[in-house]
Amino acid sequence: MPSTNRAGSLKDPEIAELFFKEDPEKLFTDLREIGHGSFGAVYFARDVRTNEVVAIKKMSYSGKQSTEKWQDIIKEVKFLQRIKHPNSIEYKGCYLREHTAWLVMEYCLGSASDLLEVHKKPLQEVEIAAITHGALQGLAYLHSHTMIHRDIKAGNILLTEPGQVKLADFGSASMASPANSFVGTPYWMAPEVILAMDEGQYDGKVDVWSLGITCIELAERKPPLFNMNAMSALYHIAQNESPTLQSNEWSDYFRNFVDSCLQKIPQDRPTSEELLKHIFVLRERPETVLIDLIQRTKDAVRELDNLQYRKMKKLLFQEAHNGPAVEAQEEEEEQDHGVGRTGTVNSVGSNQSIPSMSISASSQSSSVNSLPDVSDDKSELDMMEGDHTVMSNSSVIHLKPEEENYREEGDPRTRASDPQSPPQVSRHKSHYRNREHFATIRTASLVTRQMQEHEQDSELREQMSGYKRMRRQHQKQLMTLENKLKAEMDEHRLRLDKDLETQRNNFAAEMEKLIKKHQAAMEKEAKVMSNEEKKFQQHIQAQQKKELNSFLESQKREYKLRKEQLKEELNENQSTPKKEKQEWLSKQKENIQHFQAEEEANLLRRQRQYLELECRRFKRRMLLGRHNLEQDLVREELNKRQTQKDLEHAMLLRQHESMQELEFRHLNTIQKMRCELIRLQHQTELTNQLEYNKRRERELRRKHVMEVRQQPKSLKSKELQIKKQFQDTCKIQTRQYKALRNHLLETTPKSEHKAVLKRLKEEQTRKLAILAEQYDHSINEMLSTQALRLDEAQEAECQVLKMQLQQELELLNAYQSKIKMQAEAQHDRELRELEQRVSLRRALLEQKIEEEMLALQNERTERIRSLLERQAREIEAFDSESMRLGFSNMVLSNLSPEAFSHSYPGASGWSHNPTGGPGPHWGHPMGGPPQAWGHPMQGGPQPWGHPSGPMQGVPRGSSMGVRNSPQALRRTASGGRTEQGMSRSTSVTSQISNGSHMSYT
């Protein structure tokens, strides 16, 4: 266990700040125990620094459950530090000494339950309204700060001497709302608190229910169901209707207020703020109603304490004088009985005081006691002196000096008793007297009873504490399991999100890599096409240069041949003069040279036109090839995106199935745990009830045994009483006999005296014999009657107890059956809700997948459309430029065979497919591979004078770009292979409208 969690550890700075470092034994003196509970004791004390009266609650955190006790102390100290309200107890500090926390608070006179204990009768409605109004103001403050008291009852509603109402005992309070802990005192618990673990959370309205029960307690001296076993009361509250006021003497406003507080459904129950506007608490009432009530109570307490003092003084006096006469003692006791009955109604004790979850004195047992009625005054006085009541924490509150001054100055009796004293002197005396006087509305017998009660009834108190501890442990186990499963679910969801994110990142990286690859392919293709164009130009230029050289050589040979022919012709004609021959020969040479020059110029012009035309054709062919490559790359990219999206959707569906399986498994685990905890709880409840039944039967048997043991003494006293009556009768008869004998002796002659005496003697003997017979008969009849009465009474008590215990057991069974049914209904509801959530999530996922697929399809169509439109614009721009340069589209579309009839070293095919082979296109697939430039055409080269002959060997790829170009269709005339290929193309609009897109093959 970490040191910071160890009981009493102050290593945590936040915890250390909660406690003062001083030694409390040096700061507080004159400690007097005024209360006791399972947590420890409550003391009246005086602060030596300010001479201020305070109350100290000592709470030990050693022994069993020390860590739990320490946590309860820390929670209560934190709670007290947070609250500051006139209707809440004032916190002064907390000290630690020898594994005991000294919780110092203001001192008050007592609690509302003390009023009931002292007066032994219900409070008046106006007094209940005043107390309820003050308690409501304190509750409204707590609820506005999302805090819940969770232990509202008369014992925890305190009163100061000026008549101020204060809430106390925050050991059960919750600093968060809503909550779901099983805490409080059973008879005052709201149904949703009892069913907290089974049905969920609750809020501050549980205090409103407890306040309604407290109103009934103040009006009837005890809460509903108080004569019932505490465990049975819990079952009764959870499944039966709300209690109501029994008497008809209360006003309709009070009844409506109580009924509003005790609405079974929390949603129908008003809040504390709403109840502050109820006419019951807003009705006009005397301002001094609580002050007068407190003063009457103090007077009654003083009278009761004086009674106890006189009894003790009498006992001491008797002991000092060896005891007075019995008759005088009995007369004085009877007088004391009369005094006790005039000042108070007979108290009823309780063997059913149940401890609450609170660590305060008031919540260790209920503030009202209950025992069977006792008729004789002696038993009443014994109960008043020795029976056990519950002392609340109300006597642990300090009375402020200014409040004491106000009380003393505001008391008309104080002013009337000393009318001539100056105000300042009176105020000073009042202040000094209240500082020195131990003011309280609790009798000494109440304190003694509480201390004795804490020592007794430990078995019942421990049973309830164990039950509450079990409920807390079950709730903690369930919360631990829920947190564990929630962490597992979060971890699983995080892992799935991480897997999905990893896949998306991988897909993004792959797509980025593919795009870069495509960019590199396009750049490479551009370079290759540029090089091919240069090589193509160089090839044609080389061919043309070779042709030109051949042409020039041919001209030279022709020139020489023609020259020789001309010379021969001149030589044959000898008649022509030489000069004339020379001139004619020169002229012929010039003509030949001029003709050859013209032919050379014509050849150069045709070569230049051919070069420009072929280069333009080549560029158009390269443009179409680049378009085909772009289409292939876009198709590959879109197919890749489609594949990635399909894989992502498949993963989302798998993750949905995985989450669904985990959610159902978690729900099943929680429901199994809840069923097991309910089973253990019901088993514990049944065990506790059976133990309670055995204990009640054992107590009844013990009582009957004591009665049987006491019967001989009772019979002896009855026999002595009958014997005394017989003796008195004998004495009377003897006196009557003597009187009759004297009378007869006086009236009869002396001679008859002997006969008269004999007759009288016989008569006396006969009557005495009759008396003796009557005496024996009376004794026998008394013995038989007393034995029969005892047997009948004990048998009746046994039957009543058996019926009561059987009813409580049936009530427990009904409660447990209801809990099981509610648990099953809750499990079915949770299962249905989970199925609905899963179905909704699946539907949303499928809708998302459909939307993403539609978006991807739209993106695909848009990409294709934009690509085709851009390519069409490029073709159109190229053709427009060609027309401007004087090239016909028909001529550009029909490629010259001379472009492919001359191979050159390193020449490659013009159609490049980066994917490694001819792939499918948006149009009709081509049949056969493209033809390389280096392949010779059929029929050999044609003369340069006929450059525009038919092209038998045009590669089929050359028409591919034209076929896929919608603009080329409008520019190309019909006929020929190219026209056949282009006739199969469609426009961009028709391709998109017909759903033409890349295939996935």
Curated annotation (Swiss-Prot):
On modification after translation, the UniProt record reads:
Proteolytically processed by caspase-3 (CASP3). Autophosphorylated. Phosphorylated by ATM in response to DNA damage. Phosphorylated by LRRK2.
What molecular functions are annotated in GO for this chain? alpha-tubulin binding; ATP binding; beta-tubulin binding; kinase activity; protein kinase activity; protein serine kinase activity; protein serine/threonine kinase activator activity; protein serine/threonine kinase activity
Is the Acetylation keyword given for this protein? no
Catalytic residues (positions): 151 (proton acceptor)
Concerning what turns on (or off) its expression, the entry says: In response to DNA damage.
List its EC numbers.
2.7.11.1
| Localization per record | Cytoplasm
Low complexity: bias regions: 350-373
Predominant cellular place of this UniProt entry's protein: cytoplasm
> Composition bias, kind Polar residues: at what positions?
975-1001
BP GO annotations = central nervous system neuron development; DNA damage response; DNA repair; execution phase of apoptosis; microtubule cytoskeleton organization; mitotic G2 DNA damage checkpoint signaling; negative regulation of microtubule depolymerization; neuron cellular homeostasis
Region Disordered: start-end pairs: 324-433, 567-587, 911-1001
Phosphothreonine sites (modified residues):
669
Effect on the protein upon substituting residue 643 to A: Abolishes phosphorylation by ATM
Which InterPro entries does the annotation name? Answer: Kinase-like_dom_sf, Prot_kinase_dom, Protein_kinase_ATP_BS, Ser/Thr_kinase_AS, TAO_STE20_kinase
Q: Which superkingdom, per the lineage?
A: Eukaryota
Question: Cross-referenced CDD domains, in alphabetical order?
Answer: STKc_TAO1
Q: Impact of changing residue 167 to R on the protein?
A: In DDIB; affects neuron maturation and migration
Q: Which residues cross the membrane?
A: none
The residue ranges of the Protein kinase domain are 28-281
What family does the database annotate? Belongs to the protein kinase superfamily. STE Ser/Thr protein kinase family. STE20 subfamily.
Q: How does it assemble?
A: Self-associates. Interacts with MAP2K3. Interacts with SPRED1. Interacts with TESK1; the interaction inhibits TAOK1 kinase activity. Interacts with MAP3K7.
**Name of the molecule in the record:** Serine/threonine-protein kinase TAO1
Q: Which organism is it from?
A: Homo sapiens (Human)
Q: What is the lineage of its organism?
A: Eukaryota, Metazoa, Chordata, Craniata, Vertebrata
